[in-house]
Amino acid sequence: MKIEEFEKIMQREDREEKQEDLEKIWDSKSEWFFKRTEKKQENFSDRLIFKIVKEKKLLNENSKVLDIGCGTGRHLLEFSKFTSYVTGTDISSRMLDYAKEKLKNVNETKFIHGNWMKNFTKEKEFDLVFASMTPAISKIEHIKRMCLISKNYCMMERFVYYRDPIREEIEKMLGRKLNKLHSNHKEYTYGLWNIVWNLGYFPEIYLDKYISETEKNVIDYMEQIICTDDEENKIIEFLKEKEKNGKIMSKEYIIKAVILWDVNIF
């Protein structure tokens, strides 16, 4: 297969948004995203990404890290435990506000707002270029740029499997499948790995499998379900029966792929 075919596999059929539209979309999601991630009952520092960084000694105290699509700064905060020289970039200024607050005690932290492809062009500027779950990496040229600005490693994290039994109960009640979540787009990882390979690098892939207990509410579920008005009423009624003191405890079954490659062959 030609490398361009893997790019098509990597891309969803979602229409491309203008930068100003994307900024508005992610600004509007920032508070929801922050609250949702902060509610997760997990020790984030135990995630496979940071175990790999530690075991492979990818970073030292002088290393420079770039997080593309850093969001509210969860990964940046963990990277700052290895090095103070962390840079976060995001298209959403409100996401960056949360990140700035989270890393206010890390002296060397930098935050760059806007289109990362326009803002980062310097060759070999960072020791590690990282991206997790971001739509900002969707083309061959994006991956090439990651390799250009890194002098050592590139690392990406993506969902390849996601299961929520409560969503499955809703499907059974409605007698149909719900809309596919972005977190189940495992084809992205397949396309990404093959693009990196075809560019001449040797990507390693690791799987991070875990069960996460997450505190949700009716709104959290409804924001991710496409349905008719009649179905909406049924789903809300069903979810309210699951609620205890306004909270729904969700058990999520998750597999994430972590792809790591060295930009230096030797």
Language-model-detected regions and their locations in the chain:
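Conserved class I S-adenosyl-L-methionine
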Residues: 1-59, 62-69, 155-177
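A short acidic, Gly/Pro-enriched loop at the edge of an enzyme's catalytic core
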Residues: 121-128
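Short alpha-helix
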Residues: 184-200, 204-205
